[in-house]
Structures are given as structure tokens and as C-alpha cells.
Swiss-Prot record:
The gene is OV16. Transmembrane segments: none annotated. It comes from the Eukaryota. It comes from Onchocerca volvulus. Pfam families: PBP. Belongs to the phosphatidylethanolamine-binding protein family. The lineage of its organism: Eukaryota, Metazoa, Ecdysozoa, Nematoda, Chromadorea. SUPFAM superfamilies: PEBP-like. The keyword Cell membrane does not apply. Keywords: Glycoprotein, Signal. This is OV-16 antigen. Residues 1-16 form the signal peptide. InterPro entries: PEBP, PEBP-like_sf, PEBP_euk, Phosphatidylethanolamine-bd_CS. Hypodermis, cuticle and uterus. PROSITE patterns: PBP (PS01220). Glycans are attached at N56, N61, N119, N124.
Amino acid sequence: MHCLQVVIAIVLYSFGKISAENANCKKCTPMLVDSAFKEHGIVPDVVSTAPTKLVNVSYNNLTVNLGNELTPTQVKNQPTKVSWDAEPGALYTLVMTDPDAPSRKNPVFREWHHWLIINISGQNVSSGTVLSDYIGSGPRKGTGLHRYVFLVYKQPGSITDTQHGGNRRNFKVMDFANKHHLGNPVAGNFFQAKHED
């Protein structure tokens, strides 16, 4: 009976019906994160190396879970919770990006960043400097599923950046990470969304 409960929890979790806390996200191993990032092409479309940990992202009672599908209406507003395994006193960068703009078949605007915050103290997102305010997903009709990727980078120190934020299209998170010596992302997650009538 216990095995059946675990299977049901995993299925519900993968469809975003229950929170990460209830589904025991300690099961999200580096191998699972790496596998999902490669299976969905985030490696190599967005990053060259998958993060080793999960960033937990919730929109009210819906949880982002390694490629589950959410609607633009469900993610219209900024997430209600964003957390990751942070080191006390460390600074972090959080980015949400869409590599499928305007479509996955024709990503001429790759990437379109939807949210960019630097100098986050620990995992206190509100303590960071917002370079780009949050914009929810909004795929155009006929463009299919888009991947919306959350990445967290540990910073080597405080960042001063005035060049990013205004122009959202053709943003390259790897270029941003290289410019600021961020290395590979320490945590990540993603959902998918398509046009909603």
C-alpha cells in the first residue's frame, strides 16, 4: 500500500498538483535534474551543464516540476515562493528565461528573459536588485510549447550591471554568467506553456 501512495504522490507532483514539500523533493537528485534538463534540450539550448539542485518555484498551489505544463493564466503573476539550498551570507542571481522565442522551431529571439534579479542574499529574493521585472509566459498562437527555465547562480561577489534588463530578447544566460564569473548554475527548474485561447 505504501508503494502505491508513493507512486500517486510522484504522479501528482509531476503534474504540479501538490507542492514540493508534500512530494518530498529530496528525491530530486542531481541525476534527475540533469536528465530532465537534457531530455528537454535545456542542455545545450540554455546552459552547457545542468544544475545539481532544484530551485523550488510555486505559483500559489501549483509547483514547477522539471517540465510540467502550466498555463499562461496560472503563471501570470510572479511566483509566490522561490527557494533553493542557499549558503548563508552568499549572493545569488536568479533568472527566468524562454529559449523558444518566438517558437522552438524558429528561436530567432533566443533567449527572451522574463525575470532577472542579482545580488540576492541567501534565498531572500526580495533582497536582490531587480534588473528585469517578472513577466509571465505568453506564447503566441501556433508557436507550440515553450520552455520557461529558472536558474540560480552563486555570485563570487556583488554585481554592478546596468546593461541588462531593458532588452529582453536575444539574452544569453551563459554570456551573462561568463561576464560576471558565475560559473555553472547551482539550482534550476522549468515548466512548459503554450498559447491559451
